[in-house]
Amino acid sequence: MEPGLQQAGSCGAPSPDPAMQVQPGSVASPWRSTRPWRSTSRSYFYLSTTALVCLVVAVAIILVLVVQKKDSTPNTTEKAPLKGGNCSEDLFCTLKSTPSKKSWAYLQVSKHLNNTKLSWNEDGTIHGLIYQDGNLIVQFPGLYFIVCQLQFLVQCSNHSVDLTLQLLINSKIKKQTLVTVCESGVQSKNIYQNLSQFLLHYLQVNSTISVRVDNFQYVDTNTFPLDNVLSVFLYSSSD
């Protein structure tokens, strides 16, 4: 072919548009475009699975701790000869479960009160103490915990009434509680009042423990007879 024709042929051939030129491998395939989404979904799956496993493990640990706590709780279902109403039963159970049972007592108030110094039923529970004429007499020296609870029933008239509860050691007041009821002067059928007092005191041998009230006629021995109690136990022995 002549040189002129070759030049014309080469000039007549359309040259490719630069905009239409695509580098090899630069065309994204549909499979290649979904790879980032798959990677993200896998990350979320692994994260949620790990969180679920941690939650299951935490619940299992909590259940194990609860079961161990229940197993370590002492069984206090032993039947007691005396049954109270509000807290006297719990107090009696606490006394029975004390580590030191060398000296303790649990007494209920007598229904036949005729003195400000209260008397107690002699058929109560007494260990290491002697009961005589309203007194508990100490037989072992040491630190004693004393608690008394009384229920009062007052029929108000036109004057106020003072209710007292006094804990005495060797006939001397060591702790007392005073409550005034019927202050308004308005007549009412019944007013129930609970008084309680406790004392932690070191006692020698032959020391006496007693309880005194000013108005013994208001001590309610009928409605809640089992809630009028005196409890004593040796907290710490000196021997």
From Swiss-Prot:
Superkingdom of the source species: Eukaryota
Transmembrane intervals: 44-67
Extracellular side: 68-239
Cell compartments where the protein resides: Membrane
Membrane topology reported for the UniProt record: Single-pass type II membrane protein
GO terms assigned for molecular function: cytokine activity; tumor necrosis factor receptor binding
Span list, region Disordered: 1-36
Positions of glycan attachment: N75, N86, N114, N158, N194, N206
Residues in THD domain copies: 103-230
Principal cellular location given in the protein's record: membrane
Record keyword Lipid biosynthesis present: no
GO process annotations (BP): CD8-positive, alpha-beta T cell differentiation; defense response to Gram-positive bacterium; immune response; positive regulation of transcription by RNA polymerase II
PANTHER family according to UniProt: TUMOR NECROSIS FACTOR LIGAND SUPERFAMILY MEMBER 8
Family: Belongs to the tumor necrosis factor family.
Record function comment: Cytokine that binds to TNFRSF8/CD30. Induces proliferation of T-cells.
Record protein name field: Tumor necrosis factor ligand superfamily member 8
Organism: Mus musculus (Mouse)
Source organism phylogeny: Eukaryota, Metazoa, Chordata, Craniata, Vertebrata
